Amino acid sequence: MPELPEVEYTARQLRGAIVGATISEALVFWERTIDHPDVPNFLAEIADRRILDVRRRGKFLIIDLDGEVLLTIHRRMTGNLLLLPPGWEIDTNLKTTDPVAWNIKGPSFRPWNTEDTTNAAATDLFYCRVCFNLVDGRRLLFIDTRKFGRIGLWPSKREQEALEGLGLEPFSDEFTVEALAKALAGRKGAIKQVLLDQGVIAGLGNIYADEALYYAAIHPLRHANSLTPDEIQRLYEGIISVLTLGIEHGGTSFSEYRDLWGEAGDNYNHVRVYHQQGKPCDRCGTPIERIVLGQRSTHFCPTCQKLT
C-alpha cells in the first residue's frame, strides 16, 4: 500500500504537472471506486473543473478544484495514478467481446503511435478504474488491479468530513515530541500496531513503521505506553527521518507502487530492515528477523531492538 512518502511524492509530481489544467470529463469503468457522491452526480459535477492545487493528508491525495470542490483519492493496496500524454486511445471492445475479462482488466489504453511513448508505461495499459480527460488531451488514469482504491468528490467545506478520523500529520506544526507522547499514553497495544493506526499518526504504514522503530531501537512488540521519554524522542526523530528519506528517493516500490510517469521508487535500495530478513543488521551484524504481527510482516533486529 502506498504510504505517506509515496503519496507525497505523487502529489508533488501532480502539482507540477496538472495545476492549471481543466478536467473535461471523467470516465468511470468500475463504479465502486467512486465512494462519494453516486456515479451520475460525480460525472456531472467533475466536468469542466479547473485544477487549483494538489495536496496530501495522511495517505489521501487531495485535488482542489474551482467552484469550491475537491477530489479525494485513497489508493489503498494497489492504486496508482498515471499521467498519459495526448494521443493515447481507449479500447473498450473487451466489454462486449469478453465481459469476464472486462470485469477484471477494464479497458486498454494504447498510444496511437506505438514507437513514441513518453513515459515508462507499457504499450498496452489495463486495470484503469477511472480516467480523467484533460482539455489539453492528456489523460490522468487511476489504475488499481485489486479495486480497493476509492475516489470522492466533495464540497470544500466538507473536507473534514471526507477525511474524518485521521490522526497527527507528520511534518505539520502539530506533530511534536509532546504530541506523540500524548498520543501513545494509555495505549497498551504493541507499538508497531499503534503506529499503523491512522487515527494516531496519519500516513504511516508497514514499511515506514518498521524503519522508524529500527531507527529508534525499539522492539515492535513493546507496549506503546511503556516507552521512555528518550525512546519517544528517538521515535519522533525516526518517523521524520524515514519519511523524509522515502520522499527524497521517490517512494518504495517492492510490488505495485509506481509514480506519475510509471517509474518505480528507489527507496527500496535504502530500507534497513523492511523485507531484509536474514540479512545482517547494518549496526551490529545480527541477522534481521521477520515475525507476523496483526497479520502483517514485521521486521527488526533482535539485538538492537530488544524486547526487555
PLM features per residue range, with description:
Residues M1-T308:
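Structured catalytic/nucleic-acid-binding cores of DNA maintenance enzymes
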